[in-house]
Amino acid sequence: MSKEKIAIAYSGGLDTSVMIKWLKDKYDADIVAVTGNLGQQKEIENLESKALATGASSFHFVDLRTEFVEEYIWRALKAGALYEDVYPLATALGRPLLAKALVDVAVAENCTMLAHGCTGKGNDQVRFEVTFASLAPHMKILAPLRVWEFTSREAEIAYAMEHNIPVSATKKNPYSVDENIWGISIECGVLEDPMIAPPEDAYQITTSPEKAPDTPAVVELEFVEGVPVAMDGKKMNGLDIIVQLNTIGAAHGIGRLDMIENRVVGIKSREIYEAPAATILHFAHRELERLTLEKSVFQYKKNISQDYANIIYNGTWFSPLRTSLDAFVNETQKPVTGLVRLKLYKGNVTLLGRTSPYSLYNEALATYTEADTFNHKAAEGFIHLYGLGLKTFNQIHKG
């Protein structure tokens, strides 16, 4: 009788490395380790040998970068999705795609169980399990970190050392880092005290603004219907645009974020993020929207942006609400076409210029020179009617 198979989302980090041996011993099952490439820079070529040496029966590496950019990141960018107005949702965006890839491999490998390495008080457990339940309701879900005997990362490190499991985390390097092409999240260690500034060794890719070049970088981005298509006059695919902006932005200290955020599970947490490309692209996209969107659409879309961010953050990507909001967002993005020129300097993104064939800015109406075509006399009647309701109210209640 063949053993049952468990497909696990494997990153090669502390939790999932320990998890392979723990699950194998507890369930006497074959472990199918699955790693998705979302553009993380850390070493990935040794993951297969590491997973197999740790006890996995097989290893699958799935390149998800293009799908991640085109079907996830660009949707979030067009929606203007920043969780609580700050977080560009790098980790949160990657989870439903990783979960989907894990389900695909699990089905192909005839697995009966799905496992993730998320903590019992984090957001990712929700994102993975809601996606699993949506796409593979027949499979059993395992969450070892909610039930195993290890009560701290130090205990996991000790277990790994005892069983010769190679891990990069040590008691001297306690940070938990999650990375993809859209950003990096950094937790644990001294970062758990919100009054302590993040040490420089916590940051993975960005240069400190104080040490950034004294000469700014200037970049020009072209958008078509809300999607970046070119950089500095050169047509490029989305993946390459993000890679280049991450490199340039990181060198100039762009995209360092430090926030207290409200988790799905009801607690507040202190999060450190690095997101150079996301910071630059959201800034540029928003400025192009200011130029091209009609006032009521621009202002109403802010509500949709937060709703969309909540959907991503809360793990309900595969929902009818998200697909319905996509339809609204796509309609708003039809005129969001044009060029945006930016300056990157010591941690700051500054707007230098923008233009669009669908610009609603009319210089002849806005100017205060002799070229002015605005009908000033019309303002008197407009103001009278505009303020009539308040005038009437105050006459009655203050009379």
From Swiss-Prot:
Q: Name one GO biological process term.
A: argininosuccinate metabolic process
Name the gene. Answer: argG
The protein's name: Argininosuccinate synthase
| Any one Gene Ontology molecular-function term assigned to this protein's record | argininosuccinate synthase activity
- What subcellular compartments does it reside in? Cytoplasm
**Keywords for the protein's UniProt record, in alphabetical order:** Amino-acid biosynthesis, Arginine biosynthesis, ATP-binding, Cytoplasm, Ligase, Nucleotide-binding
Family statement: Belongs to the argininosuccinate synthase family. Type 1 subfamily.
Species in which this protein is naturally found: Chlorobium chlorochromatii (strain CaD3)
Q: In which pathway does it act?
A: Amino-acid biosynthesis; L-arginine biosynthesis; L-arginine from L-ornithine and carbamoyl phosphate: step 2/3
Which Pfam families does UniProt cross-reference here? Answer: Arginosuc_syn_C, Arginosuc_synth
Superkingdom of the source? Bacteria
Q: Which InterPro entries does the entry mention?
A: Arginosuc_syn_C (IPR048268), Arginosuc_syn_N (IPR048267), Arginosuc_synth (IPR001518), Arginosuc_synth_CS (IPR018223), Arginosuc_synth_type_1_subfam (IPR023434), AS_cat/multimer_dom_body (IPR024074), Rossmann-like_a/b/a_fold (IPR014729)
* Top EC category: ligase
Q: Which GO terms describe its cellular component?
A: cytoplasm
Q: Does the keyword RNA-binding apply?
A: no
Main subcellular localisation: cytoplasm
| EC numbers | 6.3.4.5
Q: Does the keyword Amino-acid biosynthesis apply?
A: yes
